[in-house]
UniProtKB/Swiss-Prot annotation:
GO molecular function annotations of the record: nucleotide binding
Coiled-coil segments on the chain, per record: none
Keyword Nucleotidyltransferase: no
Cellular component terms (Gene Ontology): cytosol
Family label: Belongs to the YajQ family.
CDD domains xref list: YajQ_like (cd11740)
Protein name: Nucleotide-binding protein Bd0338
Keyword entries, A-Z: Nucleotide-binding
UniProt function note: Nucleotide-binding protein.
Amino acid sequence: MPSFDIVSEIDVQEVDNAVNQARKEIEARYDFKGSKAELQWDKKEMVLLAEDDYKIGAMAGILQTKLHRRGIDIKAIKFEKIEEAGGRMLRQKVTLVQGIDREIAKDIIKLIKDSKLKVQPQVADDKLKVTSKSIDELQECISLVRGGNFPLPLQFNNMRA
């Protein structure tokens, strides 16, 4: 029976490349000269450290630009609120959103079922598996979900006939 998976994944190597590019730009920019500004990355989340709000905002802008240029959807990152880090420093955590959580999965399933397409969506861990007897129905389902406005980037893979 034909099927495909709806997933939300991020290429961690591309994120790593974007973080390294952002670090280089932060080190080279004139408005960061002589100030303490640091971008930390531990494969799960990033931490922006700087002396004031302006520098945190500039670092966030640089990071978003570099991620976008490397093909990472900006919906895949979540900026936490800025907090005090001690020693007159400010900290902002940036987390990567991977996988489809239950609430968003329910919204996607509701969208698919309301469309009256002859497909069967089901939740499997942090992804959705959609099956049907017709490949055409699956392709209509893909275009329907692409048109939906969801708060995270969605990819469609493992299309099997």
